[in-house]
Amino acid sequence: MHFSKIIAGSALSSVALAEFQNGTVTTHVTATGYTTYCPYPTTITLTICEEENICTKRPIVVSEPTTVTVTEPCIISTSYETTEVVVTTTLPSSLSPSSVAPANVTSFEGAGSKNVASALVGVVAIAAAMM
């Protein structure tokens, strides 16, 4: 049991330390069934497994738009492209901090009396609505 933990840990660390490269990655997924829709005539080649360790490639010919369903376990290959992401750590000169001072903000004194008057008008309106 400890051996498998050590192997798994070393495998993960070697993947983490590996140098990144662009390219195509192909993964294989074992599915218990497969359904797809083919809008055009085509040939699908699936690896279908009759038993756990006996798998064979089998072509499925599609002559018209239809849904293809495979109920046996099969291996599905998926490929995708990997690309390296370039991270820019410096700002362009057009986005440098501004050297202009912020504008002065002044406050208006004496506005409290206007707020009190508005509150009184609201109370009177509510009282009138209740009558």
UniProtKB/Swiss-Prot annotation:
Gene disruption: observed consequences: Leads to hyperfilamentation, increased biofilm formation and reduced virulence in a mouse model of disseminated candidiasis. Also leads to increased susceptibility to antifungals (fluconazol, posaconazol or amphotericin B) that target the plasma membrane and to altered sensitivities to environmental (heat, osmotic and oxidative) stresses.
Topology with respect to the bilayer: Lipid-anchor; GPI-anchor
Keywords (A to Z) from UniProt: Cell membrane, Glycoprotein, GPI-anchor, Lipoprotein, Membrane, Signal, Virulence
Propeptide: 111-131
Signal peptide: 1-18
Any one Gene Ontology cellular component term annotated for this protein: plasma membrane
Localization per record: Cell membrane
Record lipid sites (GPI-anchor amidated glycine): G110
Residue positions with a glycan: N22, N104
GO biological process: cellular response to starvation; filamentous growth; fungal-type cell wall organization; negative regulation of filamentous growth; single-species biofilm formation on inanimate substrate
Conditions for induction: Induced during cell wall regeneration. Expression is also increased under high-iron conditions. Repressed by the HAP43 transcription factor.
Function recorded in the entry: GPI-anchored protein involved in proper cell wall integrity. Does not seem to be directly involved in the synthesis of the cell wall. Required for normal virulence in a mouse model of disseminated candidiasis.
Protein name: Predicted GPI-anchored protein 26
Organism: Candida albicans (strain SC5314 / ATCC MYA-2876)
